[in-house]
């Protein structure tokens, strides 16, 4: 077992040394802004999907939740709120106030 561990460590060390030998030297030869790219180059690399079909309308407004008023009524009743935590809001509302 020790021999296997030693062999694995030696192989890892050899790979690290070989990787450093093939790497570019850092310093004067490396370009000044190698870590940063312009916005144009970045947008060519990362193509974002178009989110909205009609750009001139702007961002779509999220749809209003039709159950929100009922959810607030259920939250004001401690028993309904506790039951909603266990079985879900719609079922708790139905049991206390009738069909949703």
Curated annotation (Swiss-Prot):
Cellular compartments annotated: Secreted
Protein's job: The carboxylated form is one of the main organic components of the bone matrix, which constitutes 1-2% of the total bone protein: it acts as a negative regulator of bone formation and is required to limit bone formation without impairing bone resorption or mineralization. The carboxylated form binds strongly to apatite and calcium.
Disulfide bonds: 74-80
Signal peptide: 1-23
Cross-referenced InterPro entries: GLA-like_dom_SF, GLA_domain, Osteocalcin, Osteocalcin/MGP
A GO MF term: hormone activity
Protein name per UniProt: Osteocalcin
Keywords: Biomineralization, Calcium, Cleavage on pair of basic residues, Disulfide bond, Gamma-carboxyglutamic acid, Hormone, Metal-binding, Secreted, Signal
Annotated positions binding Ca(2+) 1: 68
PROSITE patterns: GLA_1, GLA_2
Gene coding for it: BGLAP
């Amino acid at each position: 077992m020790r021999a296997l561990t030693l062999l694995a460590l030696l192989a890892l060390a050899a790979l690290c040394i070989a990787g450093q030998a093939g790497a570019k030297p850092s310093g004067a030869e490396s370009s000044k802004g190698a870590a940063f790219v312009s916005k144009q180059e970045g947008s060519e690399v990362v193509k974002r999907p178009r989110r909205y079909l009609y750009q001139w309308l702007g961002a779509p407004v999220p749809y209003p939740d039709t159950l929100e008023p009922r959810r607030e009524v259920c939250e004001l009743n401690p028993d309904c709120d506790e039951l909603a935590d266990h079985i879900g809001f719609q079922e708790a509302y139905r049991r206390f106030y009738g069909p949703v």
